[in-house]
Amino acid sequence: MPPPSLLLLHPRTPLPHHHRSSFRTSSPRPSRMVCAAAEGFISAAPILLPDGPWKQVEGGVTAAKGFKAAGIYGGLRAKGEKPDLALVACDVDATVAGAFTTNVVAAAPVLYCKRVLNSSKTARAVLINAGQANAATGDAGYQDTVDSADAVAKLLNVSTNDILIQSTGVIGQRIKKEALVNSLHRLVGSLSSSIEGANSAAVAITTTDLVSKSIAVQTEIGGVPIKIGGMAKGSGMIHPNMATMLGVLTTDAQVSSDVWREMVRTSVSRSFNQITVDGDTSTNDCVIALASGLSGLSSILTHDSTEAQQFQACLDAVMQGLAKSIAWDGEGATCLIEVTVAGANNEAEAAKIARSVASSSLVKAAVFGRDPNWGRIACSVGYSGIQFDADQLDISLGAIPLMKNGQPLPFDRSAASKYLKDAGDIHGTVNIDVSVGRGGGSGKAWGCDLSYKYVEINAEYTT
């Protein structure tokens, strides 16, 4: 259906700025930092950035120039008063890109965002609600999404098509639209470029998550400092090809629309599409990426320039950091599993093998049981759908080689079991390294162990 027509103000008209108090942290453990906006509700995930020519900075989605965010409680959750409405807004028309679920039963907000991005190259804000997925809700659910976008647009004095919507929660439930609309004036009034604004938004989008996921980095491209920030949610119903995970990325780099969309697709394929918790692909997966262009960096117009390659690597790092935090926070998990595959013919084949290992319920259960059962790893490599010479298969668990040239190696089983136990005791990382030949292709995937707690959480999710 055609979108309602609203007056679009000058693209450089700033949004309201309501400054809030600075972000405060308390850190009994580095991986469990408590933010002021989230205090009493949820802690922050560990920062799991890969190494590279960038530095971590504070601010999440508000780190980049031109962005504000807010998260409030609007009464959408079934119980409790944890924030459940988030808004990320840009002062200018931001170049927009998105990636969406492959589930055929796509939620109303996914269908809406895809329609908007098919006709628009820019956006001004992303509204996210937690509590109702608004999936499998028919025409009425879709209209709820349009009405929500329209209501936000009027408060921000922009077009309805400038607003994107994300939803997460119980499938089959429509948005509590009255509660949402009644909360929007307060939500818009809370918009802030502060760190607290970013972190309150990161908390508001969570559901069964035990931690919020927020990250920001700064790098220098062409002598100009640029920032990329992001937030994500996800803990269960996580499987490659986007799963119940929502993500919002922001940057002050200036990138042409076509290049930005290709960069986002590439980074998603190397990050969010490489995580798995339970093998379920959600109806609501959605990553939205906004580029304000306010850094002062000349526009990136091609994929193959040095500046584009530097920026792509930084974008990869931010998305991988968020993706790893999601896998780390897998429902009931005691550790993160990182699978690295080398020696494949190309990156795509290596990524598929890594995904196969990280997705294996038997591998995940073995890690939880602190059982160094390399046979399960070898099996999951073999059924990945990628052809390789089994006589060149190498497998290591941490620093402990388990298989070489397709043959099992003698190893200290108690040391290998202790390696798994130690990782679980501190909610650390279990590294599984696989080589399938001498090709130049490499890739990574991330998952988590599979515990009794996972069944308990999901058996009681709607009850």
UniProtKB/Swiss-Prot annotation:
HAMAP family in alphabetical order: ArgJ
GO cellular component, one term: chloroplast
Residues with site note (Involved in the stabilization of negative charge on the oxyanion by the formation of the oxyanion hole): T168, G169
SUPFAM superfamilies for the chain: DmpA/ArgJ-like (SSF56266)
Organism expressing this protein natively: Oryza sativa subsp. japonica
Protein's job: Catalyzes two activities which are involved in the cyclic version of arginine biosynthesis: the synthesis of acetylglutamate from glutamate and acetyl-CoA, and of ornithine by transacetylation between acetylornithine and glutamate.
UniProt name for this protein: Arginine biosynthesis bifunctional protein ArgJ, chloroplastic
Note: This protein may be expected to contain an N-terminal transit peptide but none has been predicted.
Record-stated family: Belongs to the ArgJ family.
Main enzyme class: transferase
Active site: T244 (nucleophile)
EC number: 2.3.1.35, 2.3.1.1
Gene3D superfamilies membership: ArgJ beta chain, C-terminal domain (3.10.20.340), L-amino peptidase D-ALA esterase/amidase (3.60.70.12)
Gene Ontology process terms (BP): L-arginine biosynthetic process; ornithine biosynthetic process
Binding site for substrate: T207, K233, T244, E331, N458, T463
Entry GO MF terms: glutamate N-acetyltransferase activity; L-glutamate N-acetyltransferase activity
InterPro entries: Arg_biosynth_ArgJ, ArgJ-like_dom_sf, ArgJ_beta_C
Localization: Plastid, Chloroplast
Source species taxonomy: Eukaryota, Viridiplantae, Streptophyta, Embryophyta, Tracheophyta
Taxonomy, superkingdom: Eukaryota
Site location (Cleavage): A243, T244
Pathway as given in its UniProt record: Amino-acid biosynthesis; L-arginine biosynthesis; L-ornithine and N-acetyl-L-glutamate from L-glutamate and N(2)-acetyl-L-ornithine (cyclic): step 1/1; Amino-acid biosynthesis; L-arginine biosynthesis; N(2)-acetyl-L-ornithine from L-glutamate: step 1/4
Reaction catalysis annotation: N(2)-acetyl-L-ornithine + L-glutamate = N-acetyl-L-glutamate + L-ornithine; L-glutamate + acetyl-CoA = N-acetyl-L-glutamate + CoA + H(+)
Keywords: Acyltransferase, Amino-acid biosynthesis, Arginine biosynthesis, Autocatalytic cleavage, Chloroplast, Multifunctional enzyme, Plastid, Transferase
Subunit structure: Heterodimer of an alpha and a beta chain.
